[in-house]
Design a protein with these regions (language model features):
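Amphipathic alpha-helical packing segments from all-alpha helical-bundle domains
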Residues: 100-125, 131-146, 176
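Cytosolic nucleotide-binding catalytic cores of signal-transduction proteins
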Residues: 19-20, 127-128, 172
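Secondary-structure edge/capping motif, primarily at the C-terminal ends of alpha-helices
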Residues: 67, 91-95, 122-125, 151-155, ...
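C-terminal peripheral helix-coil segments that are non-catalytic and often amphipathic
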Residues: 150-192
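A short secondary-structure junction motif
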Residues: 55-62, 87, 91, 114-122, ...
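Helical hydrophobic small-molecule/effector-binding pocket
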Residues: 72-120
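An amphipathic alpha-helix adjacent to DNA-recognition modules
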Residues: 3-6, 10-14, 18, 23-27, ...
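Amphipathic, non-transmembrane alpha-helical scaffold segments
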Residues: 2, 6, 56, 104-108, ...
Length: 192
């Protein structure tokens, strides 16, 4: 029952965001739309921003669908793009409001989870410190999310497949090279 109620609140928020900015939506609007009282809302969420975060972390996380390997990262990234396209009004309203940080947090988290899986897979058999693997995943995370945010900002005009194809050209082989440079059993010398 609790999950159904949360989904009803999420659906109501998404429908309202198609008509007005988040700053203009009140909890009473959501509860009246769902036919429940305010206490029911507060039983599940602290405030509207908590609900917004729940939408991104629960609904959107399904977009990744376990595509966290080197062979499937492109599919995982495509599913993130697809989630954004399928929820365009919701994402754009969030992106263009003070609640943009929730969208960014969602993207950073999902892309990191996708990339750390790839880094871990590629690091098998290579002695690399955990903090260095995390650093590599963070580097790519910031690049990938920056590209996604620019894509959203520009109105999502470019086909996501083309962006992913271009990213693949950049990333192919580079992660392995980075892991080799971070090996703990060898010293890497930089060419000048």
């Amino acid at each position: 029952m609790s999950e159904i109620t949360k989904r009803a609140f999420a659906s109501s928020l998404k429908k309202m965001l198609a008509k007005k900015p988040l700053e203009k939506i009140r909890i009473i609007d959501i509860t009246e739309y769902c036919g429940v009282n305010r206490q029911t809302f507060y039983y599940h969420f602290k405030d509207i921003y908590d609900l917004l975060e729940w939408v991104y972390t629960n609904e959107a996380t399904k977009a990744l669908g376990g595509k966290k390997t080197y062979e499937t990262w492109q599919q995982g990234f495509k599913q993130i793009f697809q989630y954004i396209v399928n929820n365009k009004e919701f994402v754009l309203t969030t992106f263009n409001s003070v609640s943009r940080e929730y969208l960014e947090r969602y993207l950073y988290n999902e892309v990191y989870l996708l990339l750390i899986g790839v880094v871990e897979e590629k690091a098998k058999g290579i002695p690399v410190r955990e903090k260095d693997k995390s650093f590599i995943a963070d580097f790519y995370k910031y690049a990938f999310v920056g590209i996604v945010l620019d894509w959203i900002k520009s109105g999502m005009k470019e086909e996501s497949d083309k962006i992913i194809e271009r990213l693949n050209k950049l990333i192919y082989g580079n992660m392995e090279e980075a892991l080799e440079r971070y090996r703990t059993d060898k010293t890497y010398s930089y060419k000048k």
